[in-house]
UniProtKB/Swiss-Prot annotation:
It catalyses: tRNA(Phe) + L-phenylalanine + ATP = L-phenylalanyl-tRNA(Phe) + AMP + diphosphate + H(+). HAMAP family: Phe_tRNA_synth_alpha1 (MF_00281). Its EC number is 6.1.1.20. The keyword Glycosyltransferase does not apply. It is an enzyme of class 6 (ligase). The lineage of its organism: Bacteria, Pseudomonadati, Pseudomonadota, Betaproteobacteria, Burkholderiales. Mg(2+) binds at E269. The gene is pheS. This is Phenylalanine--tRNA ligase alpha subunit. Tetramer of two alpha and two beta subunits. GO terms for molecular function: ATP binding; magnesium ion binding; phenylalanine-tRNA ligase activity; tRNA binding. Keywords: Aminoacyl-tRNA synthetase, ATP-binding, Cytoplasm, Ligase, Magnesium, Metal-binding, Nucleotide-binding, Protein biosynthesis. It comes from Ralstonia pickettii (strain 12J).
């Protein structure tokens, strides 16, 4: 028992401190504390000593063993801490770095136009109304003074639906937003029927419409905005002023030139196509319009001898194409994100 126990402890501490992984640490543990380890051999040799010496040396060996075990535990904890710190460093986030942009959606360009049109007309006192896309043949055609033999009523131009409404009238996908003229006016008249004179009707009705047509400038589903202003003293001059002001606001130009070209629509009399001047002396049709036909006024529940007004209908796709310089209507419906992202 001449071995220097303090030196054994120091050797164990140095051995444990020099290893960099748990496997090596276990090897060093076996060298000092294993079945054939230095301290284990010393404990086995105590049996050869006399009782008094065995007691003294046993206490010294156990004390040294405790110090070695403490060094072993400390090194294990140090290796575990180092491993955790390495993992944390590898997964660390630099909070000073700029964040990643979250991909945001945006309105479709046609819907942008929809909202822009509604905002412009809303600023001059027009209500915004919505109506059903499935209409009766009567509301879509008859109420708007379309004769029974009008070509628009044919299945080559209109999507008819199986079944009939509660009044046994044919059903179809509306071919224009004009039925909202009659629907909104009737609600307005019902609301104010207790008055001697019905207040002015000022409304636009943007929405989806359907026709059997498809090419670079036509789609079987497209968007229109209908406009209506009826009172007791509305003239064609009001129509020209309102629509010209709308175009100047929509295109953000004060030099816009507009002309009203005589035309024919069953629901207006007189009727006019509204054209807008573009470069090189060219004119492009923007809208159909006119003074509301007396028959239509009557179908609204109003007396055409007392009330008069104007109506117009414009394609939202066409307005969008002109504003952004797009020459193919089909681009709006192909869902190409590269195209749509330009208008975000």
């Amino acid at each position: 028992m001449s071995l220097d126990l303090d030196q054994v402890v120091v050797d164990a501490q140095n051995a444990f401190a020099s290893v960099e992984d748990n496997a090596s640490l276990e090897n060093e543990k076996a060298r000092f504390l294993g079945k054939s380890g230095v301290l284990t051999d010393l404990l086995k040799g105590l049996g050869k000593l006399d009782p008094e010496t065995r007691k003294t040396e046993g206490a010294r060996i156990n004390q040294a063993k405790s110090r070695v075990e403490e060094a072993l535990t400390a090194r294990r904890q140090a290796l575990a801490d180092a491993l955790m710190n390495a993992r944390l460093a590898a997964e660390a986030i630099d909070v000073t770095l700029p964040g990643r942009d979250v991909a945001e959606g945006s309105l479709h360009p046609v819907m942008n136009t929809w909202e822009r049109v509604a905002k412009i007309f809303g600023s001059i006192g027009f209500d915004v109304a919505d109506g059903p896309e499935i209409e009766s043949d009567w509301m879509n055609f008859t109420a708007l003074n379309n004769p029974d033999n009008h070509p628009a009523r044919s299945m080559q131009d209109t999507f008819y639906i199986d079944g009939r409404d509660s009044e046994d009238k044919l059903l179809l996908l509306r071919t224009h937003t004009s039925p909202m003229q009659v629907r909104y006016a009737r609600m307005h008249v019902e609301k104010y029927k207790h008055l001697d004179r019905i207040p002015p009707i000022k409304v636009i009705a943007p929405g989806r419409t359907y026709r059997v047509d498809s090419d670079a400038t036509h789609s079987p589903m497209f968007h229109q905005v209908e406009g209506l202003w009826i009172a007791d003293n509305i003239s064609f001059a009001d129509l020209k002023g309102v629509y010209t002001d709308f175009l100047r606001n929509f295109f953000e130009r004060d030099d816009i030139q507009v002309r009203f070209r005589p035309s024919y629509f069953p629901f207006t009399e007189p009727s006019a196509e509204i054209d807008m001047a573009f470069g090189n002396g060219k004119w492009l049709e923007i809208s159909g319009s006119g003074q509301v036909h007396p028959t239509v006024v009557r179908n609204m529940g109003l007396d055409p001898e007392r009330y008069i007004g104007f109506a117009f209908g414009s394609g939202l796709e066409r307005l969008t194409m002109l504003r952004y310089g797009i020459n193919d209507l089909r681009l709006f419906f192909e869902g190409d994100v590269r195209f749509l992202r330009q208008f975000a």
